[in-house]
Amino acid sequence: QKSLQPDQMKELDALIDAETGALKFVPNPGPQTEAYFSLADELYYGGAGGGGKTSLICGLAVNCHHDIQMFRREAVQLRGLVKELSKIIGSTTGFNSQLGVWRLQDGQTIELAGVKDEADKEKWQGREADLKCFDEITHFTRSQYRFIIGWNRSTRRTATASPGPCCSTSTTCRPRCASWSSAAPRAIRTTWRN
């Protein structure tokens, strides 16, 4: 196999930079890109371990939204989100681990929270965000999920990530996962923004 010469590599890097602009996260080709550019208000994205589920929701948060809430069932599980976000952002500057709040230089706010007990959902009553992410959605109860997303408005978005058998592509969900959807009898509720 022949590798690129340093000048060719530099030229390739320049082409990539020109195409991606100021994006801190660029989705992988295929399903992750489809999910990233989906206009669905509720986005279910799944796959095998290491398939980029957490990367997708972190990338959406950093590149596309201003007020973000990211959830795991247990607060200790948030470490994976912190690690992925710091990789995308480039540092942990602005992250307050005591509060679970990340304030970025451009004014973005990313809140990280565990929703361990059923009653913990109440803490999010009336708390709007332009992106609500649930990492490992199958760990949450349907009630927790529906209550928390209930505070989204017409231009808001919810993204979920789950392991393999639940969700197969960016906008389809198999029946086992459908109980988290607002329209449980259907495979997924997809509301398109205009």
PLM regions with names:
Residues 1-194:
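Short, flexible loop motifs at catalytic/binding sites
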